[in-house]
UniProtKB/Swiss-Prot annotation:
Molecular function as annotated in GO: acetate kinase activity; ATP binding; magnesium ion binding
Subcellular location, record wording: Cytoplasm
The family this protein is said to belong to: Belongs to the acetokinase family.
Protein name: Acetate kinase
HAMAP family in the cross-refs: Acetate_kinase
Subunit-level organization: Homodimer.
InterPro entries noted in UniProt: Ac/propionate_kinase, Aliphatic_acid_kin_short-chain, Aliphatic_acid_kinase_CS, ATPase_NBD
Organism taxonomic ancestry: Archaea, Methanobacteriati, Methanobacteriota, Stenosarchaea group, Methanomicrobia
Pathway terms, separated by semicolons: Metabolic intermediate biosynthesis; acetyl-CoA biosynthesis; acetyl-CoA from acetate: step 1/2
Catalysed reaction, written as an equation: acetate + ATP = acetyl phosphate + ADP
Domain of life: Archaea
Annotated PROSITE patterns: ACETATE_KINASE_1, ACETATE_KINASE_2
Record-annotated site: Transition state stabilizer: H180, R241
Length: 408
């Protein structure tokens, strides 16, 4: 089976074509600047051969048409026609409370995705554009929707409810949803294998640390708490997001700076985090460099980030009553030894000890804890595309079996 995985953003369309026989990508591509001038498509084949083309991409549909051309290109492509693709898996950020698992796309699923536009106005609409384009260009090919929020729907009510008037939840769905669920689920599964234990018997803290960061407490393979909330703004400090702050800061700053609700939202989402504190960058590599040359605000930004992650790890050790493993994943979690060290230093009293030399290894699956560490510390590269492809394959094959078992 070949599965096309699509992640449609507001001005981008990422894709991978994965051969599920050996779970390897045949092609990885990206359409950039969709709906903007100077748009481009790049595609890298399994053998390293690369296509790069500047082409007008006014809509997601046109972008997907270019993806079809790239995948079937006589020189750079990997298939002869789109009929070789057995299924399509789409990443959708928000599934609300309706979806606890991935779902085969139909009219009801489309309606539910649209119902969540208010909850994820920056993400669900472009996600839906990608789905609609795919339905037009590849009619008859089954599509599976994999929701970022689904994995966290196992949280108990006392973990996901806010102490606000209950009717705000009933009327508007105001509660914690959590995000990065596909990544948290994938690395928790890998961690269980590294522990050599059935996932049902594990307690794992997963740290997805990138420009957007979230942490999850995973017990028996199920999310029981996570740091992001109603939106991806809650939780730890991030690249450009402030993370959790005293809510009273919002009206105070609005009054003092004469900001609208939209402007203060932009301030907290786009101008805060380590960028806002440092005044330099949201790229942690730039901050590391600046801090090493004595920039105090860069150092402060890194310390705020590391402390916020450390604090949540401590919370989740209490929530889980201990842990078998702590996992670091995503761009920063996988590649920044210095950030991992900042986060874990001072946790030795909780049985968390890392090997300095192993911690220097970047971007590969490894146990970086010492032999006497009572809690294992793993670095596990995430693979959300493969996770989406696996879910897609499973759902499509299950649906096919069900159809065969129904008498005509």
């Amino acid at each position: 089976m070949k599965v096309l995985v699509i992640n449609a953003g507001s001005s981008s369309l990422k894709y991978q074509l994965i051969d599920m026989i050996n779970e390897s990508p045949l092609a990885v591509g990206l359409c950039e600047r969709v709906g903007i001038d100077n748009s481009i498509i790049t595609q890298k084949r399994f053998d390293g051969k690369k296509l790069e083309k500047q082409v007008d991409l006014p809509t997601h549909r046109v972008a997907l048409e270019e993806v079809v051309k790239a995948l079937t290109d006589p020189e750079f492509g990997v298939i002869t026609d789109m009929g070789e693709i057995n299924a399509v898996g789409h990443r959708v950020v928000h599934g609300g409370e309706k979806f606890t698992t991935s779902a085969l796309f139909d009219a009801g699923v489309e309606e539910a995705i649209r119902d969540c536009f208010d909850l994820a106005p920056l993400h669900n609409p472009p996600n839906m554009m990608g789905i609609s384009a795919c339905a037009e260009i590849m009619p008859g090919t089954p599509m599976v929707i994999v929701f970022d929020t689904a994995f966290h729907q196992t949280m108990p009510a006392y973990a996901y409810m806010y102490a606000l008037p209950y009717d705000l939840y009933e009327k508007y769905g105001v509660r914690k949803y959590g995000f990065h669920g596909t990544s948290h689920k994938y690395v928790a599964g890998r961690a269980a294998l590294m522990l050599g234990k059935p996932i049902e018997d594990t307690k794992i803290i997963t740290c997805h640390l990138g420009n957007g960061s979230s942490i999850a407490a995973v017990k028996g393979g199920k999310s029981i708490d996570t740091s992001m909330g109603f939106t991806p703004l809650e939780g730890v400090a991030m690249g450009t997001r402030c993370g959790s702050i005293d809510p009273a800061v919002v009206p105070f700053v609005m009054d003092k700076e004469s900001l609208s609700s939209r402007e203060v939202d932009t301030l907290m989402n786009k101008k805060s985090g380590v960028l806002g504190v440092s005044g330099i960058s949201n790229d942690f590599r730039d901050l590391d460099e600046a801090a090493s040359h004595g920039n105090e605000r860069a150092e402060l930004a890194l310390e705020i980030f590391a402390y916020s992650v450390k604090r949540v790890i401590g919370e989740y050790l209490a929530v889980l009553n201990g842990a078998d493993a702590i996992v670091f994943t995503a761009g920063i979690g996988e590649n920044s030894a210095s950030i991992r060290k900042r986060i874990l230093t001072g946790l030795e009293g909780l049985g968390i000890k890392i090997d300095e030399e192993k911690n220097k290894i970047r971007g590969q699956e490894i146990d970086i804890s010492t032999p006497d560490s009572s809690i294992r510390v793993f670095v596990i590269p995430t693979n959300e595309e493969l996770a989406i492809a696996r879910e897609t394959k499973e759902i499509v094959e299950t649906e096919a079996k069900l159809r065969k078992s129904v008498p005509v």
